[in-house]
Amino acid sequence: MKLKIYTDGACSGNPGKGGWAAIILDDSNQSSISGSESNTTNNRMELMAPIMALKKIKKKSEITIFTDSKYVKDGITDWIKKWKVNNWKNSNKKPVKNKDLWIKLDNACLKHKVTWKWIKAHAGNKYNNLVDELAVSKTK
């Protein structure tokens, strides 16, 4: 099965009340999931969206995930390999922030063939705009 997933996270204050959302698309269906946390950060919410979307997909699938977070896209496609080798330390030898969520995201990706695409936020992409509105609504 081929799927597209649009994800976003938002935070009212940083830290503050946060929301995450994902829209999952296949050839004929569209579904959305979302959630919130009280004392969190925007980066944690950006990570929660793809984690929760991937958890929802039970069948092994070919998935393209669209995110407007370079933190998530670069982290999962590049930085995580180095973090694992360096015992979860970043290039400054400091512990990687949000390690718990990076591990969850990495594990969730193993079940599928995942391609990551960065898209510019607020640039007129229909699904990016929808997922942004949904994530922001969860911060209220």
Indicate where each model-derived feature is located:
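RNase H catalytic domain
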Residues: 10-17, 52-130, 134, 139
